[in-house]
Swiss-Prot record:
Gene coding for it: aroB
InterPro entries: Dehydroquinate_synthase, DHQ_synth_AroB, DHQ_synth_fam, DHQS/DOIS_N, DHQS_C
The protein's name: 3-dehydroquinate synthase
Known role: Catalyzes the conversion of 3-deoxy-D-arabino-heptulosonate 7-phosphate (DAHP) to dehydroquinate (DHQ).
Keywords carried by this UniProt record: Amino-acid biosynthesis, Aromatic amino acid biosynthesis, Cobalt, Cytoplasm, Lyase, Metal-binding, NAD, Nucleotide-binding, Zinc
CDD domains from the UniProt entry: DHQS (cd08195)
Co-factor note (free text): Binds 1 divalent metal cation per subunit. Can use either Co(2+) or Zn(2+).
Native species: Prochlorococcus marinus (strain MIT 9515)
Keyword check for Amino-acid biosynthesis: yes
């Protein structure tokens, strides 16, 4: 068994995640091996920066295997994760003549992946798509699990669908082109997995020499943390594909993080930076409610900060915080649900948190 091939086992539409150095240079071969024939048109969706780095090489490789393929770039940045970008992809799909046998490839970070996935879910009522994530955050989180969406002015990811990719191909080499701020932001999601389900991963991340290797983009260390993160997510998604139960724990830090992203203006904080602050708030609430030890909370905060991530909450109007939280997808029957830690490697879902218990962190 190849330890860097991870199956996401679902009742329908199971698929493989392959992690391999250099895999981005052999996507044509990979597609043929999973049964995608070269009679299918392919539209690669990316952004200009990523396309300049990897697009031509990917396109040439696909053409080597006689695929008819083109690249279409959307604008980069969270503020462009919207219906306008979605429509641009639809227009490109129409111009290129994508039928129901066609394939979309998302080449880029989480924004490209989310928008492309939603385009695939909705173009001609659904066509296949592949994820080739190029950021750490998209590798360990958004490329796996089938959540696709665009933002609405009233909230993040409010317009979307659960729609699984046919495959995910991860090349750690692409991280060497990533700005260090974005790499560190991706580490927030890796730390999240340690807190919610994988104590061993958390302890691995705490060790100084491991942190040094990770931040220096050591290939073996990167593959290890990507692999462990995806295995945790795959397990959770396999138990609850549509987020009716346990999958909600993957949103640890996200309720407060989305508030910060929205109210500070998309782009002021990177997604992972906002999530790191959200985890800090959730940890503090848990400490106050005696759900976990103060020592655990301090360990979490120290780990977050050791990877260069923020923990200081920005000043935000309390009324606006409630407005955004009540529009959150995790609200059920008018009640806000929060993911709070009970120990390193264990969290639970709570709906009995009073407003006063979290609003004070936004003073």
């Amino acid at each position: 068994m190849n330890k860097n091939k991870i199956i996401v086992p679902l009742s329908n539409n199971s698929y493989e995640v392959t992690i391999r150095q250099g895999i981005i240079n052999s996507i044509g071969k990979e597609l043929t091996q999973i049964g995608i024939n070269n009679n299918r048109k392919i539209l690669i969706v990316s952004n200009k920066e990523i396309s300049n780095l990897f697009g031509s090489k990917l396109l040439n490789d696909l053409k080597k295997y006689n695929f008819s393929a083109e690249i279409f770039n959307i604008k980069a940045g969270e503020s462009y994760k919207n219906l306008a970008s979605l429509r641009e992809i639809y227009d490109a799909a129409f111009e290129f003549g994508l039928d129901r046998n066609a394939l979309l490839i998302a080449l880029g970070g989480g924004i490209v992946g989310d928008v492309t996935g939603f385009a695939a879910a909705t173009w001609l009522r659904g066509i296949d798509y592949i994820q080739i994530p190029t950021t750490l955050l998209s590798m360990v989180d958004s490329s796996v699990g089938g959540k696709t969406a665009v933002n609405h002015p009233k909230g993040k990811n409010l317009i979307g669908a659960f729609y699984q990719p046919k495959a995910v191909f991860i090349d750690p080499e692409t991280l060497k082109t990533l700005p260090i701020r974005e790499f560190k932001a991706g580490m927030a999601e890796v730390i999240k997995y340690g807190v919610i389900k994988d104590k061993e991963l958390f302890e691995y991340l705490e060790i100084d020499k491991n942190r040094e290797k990770i931040l220096n983009l050591d290939n073996e260390s990167l593959i290890k943390i990507i692999n462990k993160s995806i295995r945790t997510k795959s397990y959770i998604v396999s138990k609850d594909e549509k987020e009716n139960g346990i999958r909600a724990i993957l949103n640890y830090g996200h309720s407060f993080g989305h508030v910060i992203e929205n109210l500070c203006g998309y782009g002021e904080y990177l997604h992972g930076e906002a999530i790191s602050i959200g985890m800090k708030i959730a940890g503090d609430i848990s400490t106050e409610k005696n759900l976990w030890l103060k020592e655990d909370s301090l360990r979490q905060d120290k780990l977050i900060e050791s990877y260069g991530l923020p923990t200081q909450t920005p000043k935000i109007k309390k009324h606006d915080v409630i407005t955004i939280l009540m529009g959150d997808k995790k609200v059920r029957d008018g009640k806000m649900r929060f993911i709070l830690p009970k120990g390193i490697g264990e969290v639970d879902i709570f709906n009995d948190i009073k407003e006063s218990q979290f609003l004070k962190y936004f003073d």
